[in-house]
Amino acid sequence: MTPIDNDELKCLIKAIGMKAYVEILFPALIKDKNISVMELCQKYPEFNKYTPDAQNTRRSKARKIFENGWEVEALKTISLSTRTNSCVRAKAKDLELKYKK
């Protein structure tokens, strides 16, 4: 695990979007870190609302979080954020507790 750089983590989360990370990318990548954009679009139809470039960016930024071992810390950051709705924060907290190392 790479030491956590909170500024970099926040930039990655911002590029992905908190809701997209919690509801789409974290659940997908926790099961398969090499999931393709096409598979994401098939499994999570709401991912289709993003342009192809945005889909690639969001997936690659989320993979970077996982590669650094920051996936649970990202959930914690989101669960403490005041910049997303309470449902997303609650789901992030539930996932954080479930996957905490």
Language model: regions and residue ranges:
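Short acidic, hydrophobic short linear motifs in intrinsically disordered regions
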Residues: 36-40
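Short Lys/Arg-enriched helix C-cap and helix-to-coil transition segments
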Residues: 67-83
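Short, basic interhelical loop/turn and adjoining N-cap
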Residues: 42-57
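Basic, low-complexity segments
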Residues: 1-7
